[in-house]
A protein has these predicted regions:
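Compact, glycine-rich, soluble single-domain proteins
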Residues: 2-143
Length: 143
């Protein structure tokens, strides 16, 4: 099997990176660089078949062109992930932990009941702590 760190999937390599600002109602701001899954093909691929080191480098922001209620799975994903959902205006809605499925077990689907525009997948504990703070949180995509 190829070393996945040296051999990222072709569709993953097409995902651009962009600066995303995370602002908290207390005035605190953090800036991250995230990969952007904007096409249907990029969103379908996500972090599948991507090595742990590459997943740790950049969070992955799924950008939809309308509000959706899509579900996410963890098949072919190397590490457990967190996923945070955001509204069209960038307002934080909620987050979930997505463990890797047990070998031979059907994978679970993850999502939320309300619609959302953005979903951010990541493995970073620091980012999880940032998004778990009480109070209103918003993301802004820097163009």
């Amino acid at each position: 099997e190829a070393d996945r760190c040296n051999d990222v999937p072709e569709v993953f390599a097409t995902m651009p990176t962009q600066i995303v600002e995370i602002s908290h109602e207390n005035g605190r701001r953090s800036v991250i660089r995230a990969r952007m899954a904007v096409s249907a093909r990029q969103r379908a691929a996500g972090f599948q078949h991507v090595c742990e080191a590459e997943i740790a480098r950049f969070p992955l922001l799924f950008v939809f062109d309308r509000d959706v209620r899509n579900r996410f799975h963890m098949q072919n994903v190397q590490v457990p992930l967190n996923i945070s959902f955001f509204s069209r205006s960038g307002r934080f809605i909620s987050n979930q932990r997505m463990p890797r499925p047990l070998l031979g077990q059907p994978g679970k689907l993850y999502g939320i009941e309300s619609s959302y525009r953005y979903a951010l997948e990541f493995s970073s504990d620091e980012l999880q702590q940032l998004l778990s703070r009480p109070g209103k949180i918003r993301i802004v995509l820097r163009r």
